[in-house]
Amino acid sequence: MSDPRYSIGIDLGTTHCALSYVDSSTSDGEKIVQQVLPIAQLTAPGALESRDLLPSFLYLPHESELTQGDLTLPWTASRAFAVGEMARTRGAGTPIRLVSSAKSWLCHPGVDRRAAILPSDAPPEVARVSPLESSIRYLTHLREAWDHAHPDAPFADQDVTVTIPASFDPAARELTAEAARAAGYSRMTLLEEPQAALYSWIQKSEGGWRKQVQVGDLILCVDVGGGTTDLSLIAVVERDGNLELHRVAVGEHILLGGDNMDLALAHVVARKLAQQGTQADPWQLRALTYACRSAKETLLSDPTTDAVPLVVPSRGSKLIGGSIRTELTRAELTQTILEGFFPQVDAAARPVSRARVGLTQLGLPYAQDAGITRHLAAFLGRQVAALDTLEGVQRTLPQGATFLHPTAV
């Protein structure tokens, strides 16, 4: 087998997937050119577009819902489901047929991750799939999109790296590897996401990273993703006269991220609707959550927009007249995210345990305290002595320090 021409990196995210790659024939040492694959996907029935991100959503349509050709892709005409942008937008109106957060379910030890349990609240007539199968379908789509764009360089012949949270337990890691193998990833390596972020920083420095750090520096890597928050500490040490990066600690698996923010925003909007005399049922609340996700992304990407209209369809016969209409404002978004998820706290603050209400979606053991800064304070407090036995670094904490002090974030 010849040496692979490309090194492919895949971010299998909770809410989005991405594929980047490097052509080894045009690389020279630490100077490389990284590219992102525009991923061909359906954005509406029969409408094909290539976008940098593949939304991590799977839509399972009713057998009579779409017409022939609506799900056709350049590489197949026999698909009975949709992944990506079409799945996300169509599923927002019919959430009982939408699979989301498959990555969170894949690391949930309290369920059979090979069992057909998603969508978790689908009625009996909706065929379900497993968290493992959902992941296989996302990874398969990425492989097929690559092969469509690079017919002269088959995916199976390239070196592939798939990122995972550092806090994934052995079972979740093995399930991710199993999904990749089932999707046709024959030359695959798993890489922890904080390490990937650090490698990206090193690569972008074009060899200059050694001038930006010194022995004793402690780098805090915070990865707030769609479904999880990953915390890692990496120390700069000296060994045999060379600077090295050594991982000191990895945080607990915290099921807390963008999904929780979307749920929180949906509850904020639902309370506003209730004050106006409109009560959203559970089905509408789920649809409202997806609408808030889209509105959140719009507000965060466009600083000139102050509010985004929200429309949640009714399940009754009067689909238009029965729709719920409201909006998400920038003020509501900012207050909910900053106060709820990133409050300013003392270093002694710790996550609060409480009954699982409000921000808990059926079946997923979300973190009971949404304050990411409190989880961070607890993590740094637990690691106060982490450098005491680390060779190659000479660093002392202030007298009476109660938490480990990072020098870079």
Model feature map: region roles:
Residues M1-R5, L190-V222, G381-V384, E391-L397:
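Conserved phosphate-binding catalytic cores of ATP/NTP-utilizing and phosphoryl-transfer enzymes
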Residues S2-G29, A102, E206-R247, C292:
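Gly/Thr-rich phosphate-binding beta-strand-loop-beta motif of the actin/hexokinase/Hsp70
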Residues I32-A182, E192, L263-E297, S301-V308, ...:
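Phosphate-binding loop and its immediate beta->loop->alpha context
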Residues I39-A40, L245-L256, L273-A280, T360:
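Short beta-alpha connecting loops at secondary-structure transitions
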Residues D152-P165, A280, Q284, P309, ...:
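Short glycine-rich phosphate-binding loop at a beta-alpha junction
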Residues A172, T176, A180, P194, ...:
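Extended, hydrophobic alpha-helical segments in both membrane/secreted and soluble proteins
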Residues A183-A196, P365:
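Conserved phosphate-binding/catalytic loops in two-lobed NTP-binding clefts
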Residues S186, L243, P313-A386:
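Acidic low-complexity intrinsically disordered segments
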